C-alpha cells in the first residue's frame, strides 16, 4: 500500500502536522505494510513513530523540521543513562521489524531553537559562538532520530541537519543498513554527534558524509549486558571537532569484531579513537585504509591521529575496562600531534599493531604546553608520567605492541624536540620502523620511563 501526503499550509505546525503523518504510517502498518511518501514541503512536527513493515520515504524537497516547543512532545523513556540523551525525539522506531527511512529529503533539528550562546570565541574565524542547552541538557530533542530494539532496519539517502544533540542513535538493534546519509551538525554545539551505534549487531554503514562538532561516527555499548558487534564502516567522508571514527568512551558492555575501512577525514581533533571510561571490553577492531588530517579549522588543541586510552573517569568503581587486539593499517594523516596509547595503572592494552602508518607534521604541537592547559578528560588523564611527554608515539601500560613501517615526517627545523617513541610499562614490543625517528635525529630515539619495560625487540636503534 502507498500513501501520498501533500503539504497543506493551512494545517498548523506542530502536533497537527505530526498527527497527519502518524495517521498515514499507522494505516499502512495496520494494512500489512508499505510506503508512506512525503512530498515536497516544510513539515514542522513533533515526535513521529515509525512502525513495523513501513518505509517512510522523504521525497526531494521534503523537509521534516523539529517544532521548537518541547511541551508538545511526548516524554519517552531513556535507553541509557547519559546526560546527552533527553526524553524527546523527532523520529522514533521502537520494537519494530522491517522498518525503513529513505529518500532525498531533509530532517532538520532546528538546533539553535533549543540553545543559547554561552561565550564568544574571539580568536576563531567569523566570531563563532559556543552554545549550551537552554533549560539544561534535557531541554532538546536528543537523539533527534532514534531506533530502539529494531530488526532489519534500513536508512538510506536522506540528509540530517542541525541536530540539537545527538543526530542518529541506533540502540540494541539487529541487522542494520545505513547507506548514503549526509549529516551536518554545528561545530560548536553541545554534543552534536553524527551517527551513534550503541549495543547493536550486524551493522553496515557505508557511503556517508558526516560533518559534526562532536564525534562523527562512534560505537558504544552503554548498558552492561549490551553487545555491539559485527559492525563495518566503509567508504565514508568525515569531519569533526572531536573524533572522526571511534569506539567508546561509554563502554559498559562489549564491542567486538569491528572494521573501519576506506574512509577520508577532512578534519578532526582525533582521527581515530578507542576510549574506555567504564569497565566494559573492546575486542578485535581493525582500522584500515584511512587518510585525512587532524587539523581542526578553528585551531582546537591536542590533536591525535590515533588515540587509545583506558581510564577510571572519576568513578568510585575501581574496575577498569579492557582493550584487546587492535590493528591500525595503511593510515595516512596530516597532524601536529602524537599517537597516544595509554592505560591507567591496574589495566593494560593487550595487543596493538600499527602497520604502515605515516604521519606528516606541518608544525609540532608541544604537549608540555597544550596538555596542562586543557580541561579535557580525553587526554590520558590517569597517566601523569606520559600524558604530556614529547614523543611521536607514546605507550603506557601496553602488552604485545608492534610498530611496523611507522613513520613521522617532521618539519624541517621544527621545534620542540621530540623522541620517536616513549614507553612506560611496555612488554613484548616489536619495533620494525626505521623511519620512525626523533626530532632532531640526534636526540635519543626511545625514551624509557620506569623499570617495568620488558621483552623489547628493538632491531632499529639510532641512539
Where are these regions (language model features)?
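Extracellular/periplasmic carbohydrate-active domains that bind, remodel
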Residues: 1-463
Amino acid at each position: 500500500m502507498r500513501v501520498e501526503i501533500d503539504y497543506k499550509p493551512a494545517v498548523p505546525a506542530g502536533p497537527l502536522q505530526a498527527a497527519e503523518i502518524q495517521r498515514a504510517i499507522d494505516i499502512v502498518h495496520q494494512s500489512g505494510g508499505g510506503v508512506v511518501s512525503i512530498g515536497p514541503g516544510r513539515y514542522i512536527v513533533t515526535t513521529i513513530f515509525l512502525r513495523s513493515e513501513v518505509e517512510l520515504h522523504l521525497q526531494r524537497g521534503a523537509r521534516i523540521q523539529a517544532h521548537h516547543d518541547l511541551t508538545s512532545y511526548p516524554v519517552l523513556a531513556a535507553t541509557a543513562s547519559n546526560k546527552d540523551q533527553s526524553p524527546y525525539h523527532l523520529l522514533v522506531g521502537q520494537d519494530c521489524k522491517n522498518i525503513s527511512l529513505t529518500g532525498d529529503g531533509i530532517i532538520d533539528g532546528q538546533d539553535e531553537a533549543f540553545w543559547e550562546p554561552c561565550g564568544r570565541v574571539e580568536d576563531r574565524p567569523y566570531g563563532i559562538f559556543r552554545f549550551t542547552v537552554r533549560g539544561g541538557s534535557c531541554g532538546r530533542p536528543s537523539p533527534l532520530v532514534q531506533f530502539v530494539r529494531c530488526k532489519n532496519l534500513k536508512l538510506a539517502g536522506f540528509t540530517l541537519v542541525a541536530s540539537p544533540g545527538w543526530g542518529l542513535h541506533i540502540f540494541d538493534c539487529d541487522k542494520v543498513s545505513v547507506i548514503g546519509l549526509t549529516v551536518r551538525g554545528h561545530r560548536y554545539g553541545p554534543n552534536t554527534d553524527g551517527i551513534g551505534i550503541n549495543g547493536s549487531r550486524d551493522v553496515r554503514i557505508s557511503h556517508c558524509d558526516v560533518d559534526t562538532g562532536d564525534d562523527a561516527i562512534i560505537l558504544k555499548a552503554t548498558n552492561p549486558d549490551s553487545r555491539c558487534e559485527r559492525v563495518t564502516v566503509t567508504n565514508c567522508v568525515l569531519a569533526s571537532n572531536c573524533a572522526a571514527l571511534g569506539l567508546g568512551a561509554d563502554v559498559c558492555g562489549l564491542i567486538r569484531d569491528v572494521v573501519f575501512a576506506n574512509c577520508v577525514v577532512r578534519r578532526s581533533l582525533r582521527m581515530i579513537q578507542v576510549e574506555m571510561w567504564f569497565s566494559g571490553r573492546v575486542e578485535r577492531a581493525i582500522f584500515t585504509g584511512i587518510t585525512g588530517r587532524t587539523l581542526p579549522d578553528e585551531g582546537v588543541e591536542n590533536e591525535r591521529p590515533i588515540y587509545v586510552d583506558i581510564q577510571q573517569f572519576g568513578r568510585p568503581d575501581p574496575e577498569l575496562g579492557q582493550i584487546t587486539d587492535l590493528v591500525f593499517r595503511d593510515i595516512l594523516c596530516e597532524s601536529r600531534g602524537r599517537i597516544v596509547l595509554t592505560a591507567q595503572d591496574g589495566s593494560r592494552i593487550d595487543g596493538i599493531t600499527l602497520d604502515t602508518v605515516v604521519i606528516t607534521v606541518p608544525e609540532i604541537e608541544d604537549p608540555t604546553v597544550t596538555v596542562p592547559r586543557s580541561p579535557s578528560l580525553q587526554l590520558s588523564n590517569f597517566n601523569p608520567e606520559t600524558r604530556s611527554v614529547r614523543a611521536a608515539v607514546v605507550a603506557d601500560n601496553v602488552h604485545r605492541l608492534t610498530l611496523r613501517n611507522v613513520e613521522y615526517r617532521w618539519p624541517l627545523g621544527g621545534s620542540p624536540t621530540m623522541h620517536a617513541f616513549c614507553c612506560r610499562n611496555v612488554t613484548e614490543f616489536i619495533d620494525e620502523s626505521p623511519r620512525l625517528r626523533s626530532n632532531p635525529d640526534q636526540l635519543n630515539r626511545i625514551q624509557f620511563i620506569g623499570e617495568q619495560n620488558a621483552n623489547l625487540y628493538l632491531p632499529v636503534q639510532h641512539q
